[in-house]
Curated annotation (Swiss-Prot):
Its biological purpose: RuBisCO catalyzes two reactions: the carboxylation of D-ribulose 1,5-bisphosphate, the primary event in carbon dioxide fixation, as well as the oxidative fragmentation of the pentose substrate in the photorespiration process. Both reactions occur simultaneously and in competition at the same active site.
Protein name, as recorded: Ribulose bisphosphate carboxylase large chain
Natural source organism: Aegilops crassa (Persian goatgrass)
Assigned GO CC terms: chloroplast
Catalyzed reactions: 2 (2R)-3-phosphoglycerate + 2 H(+) = D-ribulose 1,5-bisphosphate + CO2 + H2O; D-ribulose 1,5-bisphosphate + O2 = 2-phosphoglycolate + (2R)-3-phosphoglycerate + 2 H(+)
């Protein structure tokens, strides 16, 4: 029934069935296995003919695969755990606007994770004060600052004013540090036309990157923005706001690894992926599974990490995972070890909550990162020696020492809801 409803079937036989080849177009369930430890749950493998899907359209793909079938009365629950995108279909998508290597070259930054900060409070600041916070963080040593997902164009801070003050912060901090800086200017809007207008203004300001909320904005809007960014040299940061409504429950909805694959096809250079160690949901092996699906060109099937199918992206550019949410300097060794160089480590309160101010908070993060990267390059074990590495760096960085003192007791020790077993 699931395969039929999402392909050629309906609730009764219809006379127009005779006008086409149902055998050619119908979906097929080709394997069923029980879920270990559950009496009434099964994993079903369903295959669909490629002719059912419009080329280059994530919107059409999801309308078929996760459409009406999820509302069937006959099903207590239904969850899409994974999907394999065959190369024949994935080649109809252009993928990320630029990809990891092109971003490295644009920023001229290599050999370490990138550092970011989400400006807080996320709502309520005036555009001028918002821009000031951006400048202080970038001047202190961060690579990026960021609009939060619900910063669009509200009465207290209209989008055009925010873009102007953030651009000023970028140029001023670049002149003082000699490094390329950026701010994720959120172009998400109520219409595609307005979204593109904001992206055009960002390009005219000469900033390197814009941002989109791809689930609330929609895949059609996201792919539209992706094409504009590719054509005009803008990097595209993606926020996954609303994902937990879809992916957090174990028995219904869709796993984030599916949303991650869809984003790679629709287009984005960064996407939030959880932290493993922070305040947001994310088991380590499962998170690393979909991080590999975002970054790597070829990923082998690995059920231990939740990867049900071997995925060949056929040289589609990779997406940089962004670790963000409840992280601070004590997490830096673990984040560096877990995510590696091709990642963005994004601290909001972990920068702006520094007792000495925003710039010292940024400096503390940069020193902690540089210390961890140096220790790793020297062959030290970050997982085992991480705290020792951070304490040693505190001796020559008073900003880091102050940050370590403030957050020494802050932990987020909750069991994840969505686990592999």
């Amino acid at each position: 029934a699931v395969a039929a409803e999402s392909s050629t079937g309906t609730w009764t036989t219809v006379w127009t069935d005779g006008l086409t080849s149902l055998d050619r177009y119908k979906g097929r369930c080709y394997h069923i296995e029980p879920v270990a430890g559950e009496d009434n749950q099964w994993i079903c493998y369903v295959a669909y003919p490629l002719d059912l899907f419009e080329e280059g359209s994530v919107t059409n793909m999801f309308t078929s695969i996760v459409g009406n079938v999820f509302g069937f009365k006959a099903l207590r629950a239904l969850r899409l755990e994974d999907l394999r995108i065959p190369p024949t279909y994935s080649k109809t998508f252009q993928g990320p606007p630029h990809g990891i290597q092109v971003e490295r070259d644009k920023l001229n930054k290599y050999g370490r994770p990138l550092l970011g900060c989400t400006i807080k409070p996320k709502l309520g600041l005036s555009a001028k004060n918002y821009g000031r916070a951006c400048y202080e963080c970038l001047r202190g040593g961060l690579d990026f600052t960021k609009d939060d997902e619900n910063v669009n164009s509200q009465p207290f801070m209209r989008w055009r004013d925010r873009f102007v003050f953030c651009a000023e912060a970028i140029y001023k901090s670049q002149a003082e540090t000699g490094e390329i800086k950026g701010h994720y200017l959120n172009a998400t809007a109520g219409t595609c036309e307005e979204m593109i207008k904001r992206a055009v203004f960002a390009r005219e300001l000469g900033v390197p990157i814009v941002m989109h909320d791809y689930l609330t904005g929609g895949f059609t809007a996201n792919t539209t923005l992706r094409h504009y960014c590719r054509d005009n040299g803008l990097l595209l940061h993606i926020h996954r706001a609303m994902h937990a409504v879809i992916d957090r429950q174990k028995n219904h909805g869709m796993h984030f690894r599916v949303l991650a694959k869809a984003l790679r096809m629709s287009g984005g250079d960064h996407i939030h992926s959880g932290t493993v160690v922070g305040k947001l949901e994310g088991e380590r092996e499962m998170t690393l599974g979909f991080v590999d699906l975002l970054r790597d060109d070829f990923i082998e099937k690995d059920r231990a990490r939740g990867i049900f199918f071997t995925q060949d992206w056929v040289s589609m550019p990779g997406v940089i995972p962004v670790a963000s949410g409840g992280i601070h300097v004590w997490h830096m060794p673990a984040l560096t070890e877990i995510f590696g160089d091709d990642s963005v480590l994004q601290f909001g309160g972990g920068t702006l909550g520094h007792p000495w101010g925003n710039a010292p908070g940024a400096a503390a993060n940069r020193v902690a990162l540089e210390a961890c990267v140096q220790a790793r390059n020297e062959g030290r074990d970050l997982a085992r020696e991480g705290n020792e590495i951070i304490r040693a760096a505190c001796k020559w960085s008073p900003e880091l020492a102050a940050a370590c003192e403030v957050w020494k007791a802050i932990k987020f020790e909750f069991e994840p809801v969505d686990t592999i077993d």
